[in-house]
Amino acid sequence: MNISELWRFPVKGLRGELLKEVAITPNAPFPLDRRFALAHGKSGITYESPKWALKTEFHMLMHNLDECLTELTPHFDETSRLLTILRNGVEEARTFVDDPRGQEEINRYFKRLLSKTDSTIGPQFVQALDFQFGNIEEPVISLINLASVRQLSETIGKHIDVARFRGNIIIDGASPWEERDWVNRIVTINDATFIVVDETIRCGATLVNPDSCERDLNIPKFLQQNYGHMFCGVYLIAKQEGIISPDASISVSN
């Protein structure tokens, strides 16, 4: 088994960034993964008072009319604190995230973009401080098995892009659904070690085609109908530091 791809998603719900390597820190997510998010205006979550919350409090692909988020690619420079948003490859917004005027500008941009779903107060661009805006509160890293996605694709007779699952670590060379037996086991990649803490249940976000931005495949329904569950992938928590990169070998032990 080996790593096929590594991804992080600086802004929850938007497109990800393909990585050449990742420095793993114990009990921490990928650097910058889900660092920022778009909280619903009525959630009470603000840039000044950020907090972890359930995904229902945020704009993300699970929600109808938020599909346009998959057209957006964020680039964040941690040194300058400059966030740039590209839409289909064209720059649409840029702002220094710690500047109050910049925060107002990015909020106005997303209010225009998401006016059909959050027209009163508007989305609030927020930053996580010592946590991430993940789907669960623990500092997890998401792993997706390409073989499982391929088998599901063959079963339903339709191509499924692994990008629908928004995983951090994409692996190849495992058996289909082998990862379902890894809960409470240790994954080792180079010097880094992880414990598998849970399976990942799939939600309506996976319905969205990352290329067309349309809801065209009901992935949770297909999983339930064909396998009797709605899981695809597992969550890891890092336990030992190390550097991981594509093509690195993966081992699983008790």
What are these regions (language model features)?
Residues 1-254:
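Metal-cofactor-dependent catalytic cores
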